[in-house]
Amino acid sequence: MPGLFAAKKLKKNRQNFKWKDVDYKRKALRLDVKADPLEGAPQARGIVIEKVGIEAKQPNSAIRKCVRVQLIKNGKQLTAFAPGDGAIGFIDEHDEVMIEGIGGPSGRSMGDIPGVRWKVSKVNNVALSEMVSGKIEKPVR
């Protein structure tokens, strides 16, 4: 057992050992925010560069419809999933889209779409889900 007045040393040791924990280190140094294309924001606007089809991982067989987006705030490019049946038809090149996280574990990709961490939520300031359900028509810019 340590001595009666060893609390300061024990506490210091615990603080030093924290830095061996990968999760603590990533959070303390804010590495996730630094590597994040959205720079820690929940959503971001971008311009559609092209439409791409991404093959689903095994055992599924499908082509998931996605778009390449260039962010307005920093010029970084990323791939965003277009959720919904026929949603890709409402998105054209040079449209302004709002993207958000796709909702995978720890901010990562979800399901069978490899390497895609984002999804399109709005196209030209109109909700994509509303257009897919037929409630609203896509505005002409």
Curated annotation (Swiss-Prot):
Part of the 30S ribosomal subunit. Keywords: Ribonucleoprotein, Ribosomal protein, RNA-binding, rRNA-binding. It comes from Methanobrevibacter smithii (strain ATCC 35061 / DSM 861 / OCM 144 / PS). It comes from the Archaea. Belongs to the universal ribosomal protein uS12 family. Disulfide bonds: none annotated. Signal peptide: none annotated. This is Small ribosomal subunit protein uS12. The gene is rps12. SUPFAM superfamilies: Nucleic acid-binding proteins. One of its GO terms (cellular component) is small ribosomal subunit. One of its GO terms (biological process) is translation. The keyword RNA-binding applies. NCBIfam families: PRK04211.1, uS12_E_A. InterPro entries: NA-bd_OB-fold (IPR012340), Ribosomal_uS12 (IPR006032), Ribosomal_uS12_arc (IPR022863), Ribosomal_uS12_euk/arc (IPR005680). With S4 and S5 plays an important role in translational accuracy. Located at the interface of the 30S and 50S subunits. GO terms for molecular function: rRNA binding; structural constituent of ribosome. The keyword Ribonucleoprotein applies.
